[in-house]
């Protein structure tokens, strides 16, 4: 996904981790984790990709990805998929979303960064509800937000969060394809809520 659509995100993630002193490797022969196939009902085909993923990354101490959706699929679904193949999943316990890895593993006390702008935080559904990057509003638990914690280490930044703070933006992977009209309406609402904060940028 990152390779094909947003390669600049992959490059930026690599550079960020290197700047934080992490020994980073990037296996050039990695492929998709299998989520699109599994979501479309082809779990048998997805199992081949899950097995390849697990074998490729078993040599590493940590696995870090910038896509919360992909990370959540590996963490939560690969163990069950691979168990049907008689394979013990090794990746699920050591894969992290980029934000969670920096927040929970590296735990920086400061960042060499300055960004004097107003920024609104987008709390993605997979990040919130599957990776617990922030407190899901429906759980009625004390609020926390790992991305906000990290952004507060950036000099000059002003941080905002929209109303309906963790309401779905309408993307949802295949939902955006299968229910395009509904997805667009939800996306417009989410953008409006972000714009109402007065932010110059949106990040997630």
Task: Label each PLM-derived region with a short phrase.
Residues 1-204:
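Iron-sulfur cluster-binding electron-transfer modules in prokaryotic oxidoreductases
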